[in-house]
Structure formats: C-alpha cells, structure tokens
Swiss-Prot record:
Disulfide bonds: none annotated. NCBIfam families: rpmF_bact. InterPro entries: Ribosomal_bL32 (IPR002677), Ribosomal_bL32_bact (IPR044957), Ribosomal_zn-bd (IPR011332). GO terms for molecular function: structural constituent of ribosome. It comes from the Bacteria. This is Large ribosomal subunit protein bL32. Keywords: Ribonucleoprotein, Ribosomal protein. GO terms for cellular component: large ribosomal subunit. GO terms for biological process: translation. The keyword Transmembrane does not apply. Belongs to the bacterial ribosomal protein bL32 family.
C-alpha cells in the first residue's frame, strides 16, 4: 500500500485547498418587480421569468 514519503506541510495543504471554497451566488434584479433573485430562476417575489408569469400569486 502506498504511503506519503514526506509529511504534507501546512502551506502545501492550504495552497491545495485555496480552490475548495464557496462561491457567491449570481444575484440579479428582477425586471418585473425589482427584487433581487438568482439568475436563470423564477422570481420568488412576483413569480415571473423572462417577462411571463410562471407562478400565479
């Protein structure tokens, strides 16, 4: 069974983990009601998507 020849240093470990992070979600303003919403998703406030009402309130 293969084992590491040398111990991985703190710096080497942290440099490897710099890419393992959470991203900020892409928020845009709804053109219909002006609320902030996730892009490419139905607006939770007014229920519209691409100018059409998808969810009736």
């Amino acid at each position: 069974m293969a084992v590491p020849f040398r111990r991985t240093s703190k710096t080497r470990k942290r440099l490897r983990r710099t890419h393992f992070k959470l991203r900020v979600p892409g928020m845009v303003e709804c053109p219909n009601c002006g609320e902030m919403k996730l892009s490419h998703r139905v607006c939770k406030a007014c229920g519209s998507y691409k100018g059409k009402e998808i969810v009736s309130k």
